[in-house]
Amino acid sequence: MRLGYRFCRFLCQGCCAVYLKARCFGVGNVPPAGGVLLVSNHQSFLDPVLTTMALYREGNYMARDNLFGNPWFRRLIEYLNAFPVRRGTADLAAIKESMRRLKQGRVVLMFPEGTRTPDGRIGPLLPGMFAIAKKTGVPIVPVLIDGMFQAWPRHQLLPSPGNVIIEYGQPVVPGQFEELSAEQLMEMVRRRLIAMQHRWHRLLPERRLEWYRPDECPDEMNTGCE
């Protein structure tokens, strides 16, 4: 890990721990070497920081292309391993760059909802990102962010103090999905993320949302669905 990246990581850890009371669980589920695809739900602009600050490896992630317009900010996010993606299109250049970095043995973070949640729930996922995992043969680690929607909903200009949880789930290894289509793999990962979120909301009932349809929940979680 580069010294400058390590410093930024340390700074983010301190700020998020104090202001957002951010806690990370399951970091050991991220393999220590080799290409890894982190698949996270998307609650706020801070999600790339929250999902990578606890890792002992540098994270790589897509960022909206309009964030690269300012040369100073561009230098910063490129140093932090961001690369541009055009939203609303099948950006082949971004897909190829993701695959290149995964094949180099890096950690790549993606938010397959494509946009921030409007209500805190995990929305439909885009299957194209799961096709990347199938083509590169890397493990997928589902990552849940919970509490950032309450701290920084879409209509709010700046984040409020919060109580944020980041959980890294058990990896989905290639042997578990090589026979699945990208759509089936997408649904498997989404259901895991929903189950992770549901478990935290059972422990922290003040966060409980209007829940998902019963057919969206794993069987053991149906008691919390509408």
Give the label of every model feature segment.
Residues 21, 35, 163-165:
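A residue-level signal for beta-strand positions that form part of recognition/binding surfaces
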Residues 22-24, 82, 140, 166:
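Generic structural signal for residues in well-ordered beta-strands
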